[in-house]
Amino acid sequence: TIPRHDPDYYPLTMLNYLFGGQPMSRLFMNLRQDKGYSYGYYSTINWLTGPSALFAGGAVETDVTKESVVETLKEFSDIRSGRPVTQEEFEAARDGIFKGFPSNFETQGQLVNQLSRLALFGLPDDYYSNFIANLEAVTLDDLHRVAAERIDDAHLMVLVVGDREVIEPGLSEL
């Protein structure tokens, strides 16, 4: 994905939150709640100083490995164009991030971690003071644009760990 300083950081952060960043996200609801394939299925962005990486996944039973990969790829496709983010999802993601933001500063360790990110990424001293305002500026149209521009099915990589003899036949069909 994008580097940490990219202007699309805030929309992509919000998009990830509703895609797989919390228990009411699309990935979690599909693979845990609807299908029962996993106890937890999430996505996260590993922000780096250069291009970053969006990861999605979770532990699943061997016999539903293929189906889990299919559903994950479907969710990527859906959020990009098949089933765009709704106003309700947008508002829930925004509110969830806002409500959870203070919990990033509850302990000394968390405070040190957040302050070290300022130095690591070369962020301004007022970054955290402006974080909520920057997220408030994100629109639903921004999420649609970022999903269409930043999630590219052609660049997705699939990594599966498990009993190769059991899972490879199903995965080779994809």
Predicted region positions:
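PPIase-associated folding chaperone regions across multiple families
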Residues: 7-14, 151, 166, 170
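Short phosphate-engaging motifs
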Residues: 23, 64, 166-167
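Active/ligand-binding-proximal structured segments within catalytic/core domains
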Residues: 6-19, 26-29
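Short acidic-hydrophobic sequence patches enriched in Asp/Glu that either
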Residues: 7-10, 23, 71, 89
